[in-house]
Amino acid sequence: MTPPPPSPLLGTQVKEDRADYKEFQDFSSLPDTHNIAWDHSFYPFQEEEEHGVKGVESVLEKGVLDEGVLEAWGCCRRCRHAGWNRSQPSPELAGAVIHARAPAVGCRQRSGHLHVRLKQRLLERPCQEPLGKKYQLELPPLYERARKPEGSKNLPADGQGLRAVRADAALPVWPGGPGRPGPHAPEAGAEGQHQGQWPPADTRHLRTPKWPYKVATEEKPEAEEAEKKRQAKVQEKRLPPWKKRTLNQVHRVPWGQHRACQVMLLVSTKQLQRYLHFEKPAKPANMGQDPDCFGKSEGELATCLCGGESVVGETEAPGVRPDPRPEKDAKPAVSGCQEESWLQSEYDEMHPREEMNVPSLRSGSGCQVSGSPLAKGLHPLQPCHPHYMMWECCLFTLTLGTQACFEVCARRLKLAHFCPDTSLWSCGGQSPPVLCQLLDIISVSRDKVIGSHEKKPSSNPNQDDFHSSEYAYRCGIAEAVGLPSIPVHPIGYYDAEKLLEYESLLLQVSEPVNPELSAGPITGLLDRLSGFRDHGPPGSSCRSQRKGNGVETKDQAHRNRDPRGFQGGVLTARLFKMQVSLELFCGHQEHYLTRPVLAPGYPVHLGKAGTHWEQGPNMPTPEQHGTWGNRHLFAVLPLLFYTSLEIMSIGYSVVMAGRNVWQPTKGQMPHQPEQSCQTLALPMTIRHSWEGGAIRESSGWVSWKCHLKATEASQNPCVRATALRVGCSAVTYGVLGQAQGSAPWTSAFKTFSAGIAGLERHAWETM
């Protein structure tokens, strides 16, 4: 469609066609008058070409002289679209100040172009309606607008400002750009003053591009070669990647380093079924030692623990800082180990990718402490007996701060602390063997290292100063590497307060309790907690359907908070799906926590997958179920304690016991068989801190404890583990040993806590 000729100038007689004018009495009936900011509000759809920008050329060609201003004034006076159905003229519709902006309206780049383009459209179509005198009518000074710095991207070339652009296109063009010089433009001499200010025309499209084959044959190989050289230089600066050594790997911790360094201490399970069950130990042996290491001094023990080749046990001279990096092209001493790739983290910590649940005891330098049976003094080839067991899983992380800490710790790793024979316990026959006896000086805080430089706490649990210092085994979640992201649904503050109040009553008991009545407090606590409702974690399918009081259903977020900022809800076992790989114990199976476990300290046994939980003293024997067989039982001890009103710690203890460890005897409390038996608890404590209702950090803790073994004086012990506040992260377990008559209560002992680094999210998932 050919655009119409430009509008005639003032004073020119033009034959008017009456068909072009039409009187409207009701302006609301006009088509498309609802939106003044849209291009179609003034001109019907698809008529832009008919009413293009060509009509304003006659105005812009005049320049900035008085004649051009008068002509623009005449055009605005004849614009019939301005001020329709208004007593006052509208500056939005016909405001002659083209580049004016409304002060109360935020004008973006797109809306600014629309506003200016709209006013230019109004100047193209003259009208007969008068305009108010208070609106100044003028055109922008073209040459002053064009005075931009050289190389400016928003400066169009000569003649580029008269493009036909839709009002809503918002292209980066200058609506008030300079037009073509008209008859009233300055002379050539005056125009030459501004010639140096115009940028050169863009001729990039005229350049001849290179042929594709030339780019492929010349430039691409050169670029690839340069990239290879750059990567080679970067690789030279990097440390060699760590390799997993199943027996020995030297990795020193820098001397005096106050940052928490996580080191994995695991136990190998390649031959688990051969040595986890034994009938009687042959003789006491140091943990991880070969028979050749017996009788050696403590100074030689650490070297023997690491295979005799490691430098872990060497004593560093005072003030000498060992190089934390391994020597270049140096091969660590290994024997019969298989190299596998490890994950390289920020602090050069070694965490396996696939064998998160496969224990392998490793020292602070990254070397394997024990690579064969847990103790060479045991009889690994003896047949499995259902009544006896050793440590079934040793999976925890030890936080080390300096090399000296590990040296002292490694010299205390002795099997005598773990031997089931009470005569071999270093602390006497009344105290159970606990792991913290061995690791009593390992602690890293934010400001100092508690180790050989300060007074060491007692390693005897019967003494008062045993682990009396406050420990911070993890400085914070930002400084921890390898921690799993374990979601936690915290217990309600009111429920936790009632639970702690009831637990405090259990701790006030100072006399032996009749075995027939010992289950009373546990039963009462279960009755008290039976009314608790589990709302489940956000997004879970087991959320409560109960409505009201701010309790959400389905996938709604929790909004039930009390004034202290604690999130509402109840912590139960349903909140976690504990997916345990039983490859370490009894084949490839999975066990799930299917029912809430609310009895603190009372073992709740789980049989084979698919069986139900059993609580209370009248638990049937494994033979009555017919599905347990020689499988191991799992017991869960939920732990809940507050270190302060702002910090809440929640824990689970997973106890692995033998098949016939707990048996009911004529309705009385379960007792242990005459033979000695030990169980290992792995409580999982999730530590959360609240500041104004927001979770500040989330850390994992692992604690270890060993149940009291049966002795001649106490055949029916009832072990309860109650979590108390000790420092900021340590856990104290009150172990109450009872017998039929007069069995003394044993003193409480504490467990060693450390951060979790071996468990991954696949081991702990929300249901």
From Swiss-Prot:
Record InterPro entries: PA_dom_sf
Gene source species: Homo sapiens
One function term, GO molecular function aspect: carboxypeptidase activity
Top-level lineage group: Eukaryota
Compositionally biased tracts (Basic and acidic residues): 322-331, 552-564
Protein name as catalogued: Putative uncharacterized protein ENSP00000334305
Residue segments, region Disordered: 171-209, 314-340, 533-566
GO CC terms in record: plasma membrane
SUPFAM superfamilies: PA domain
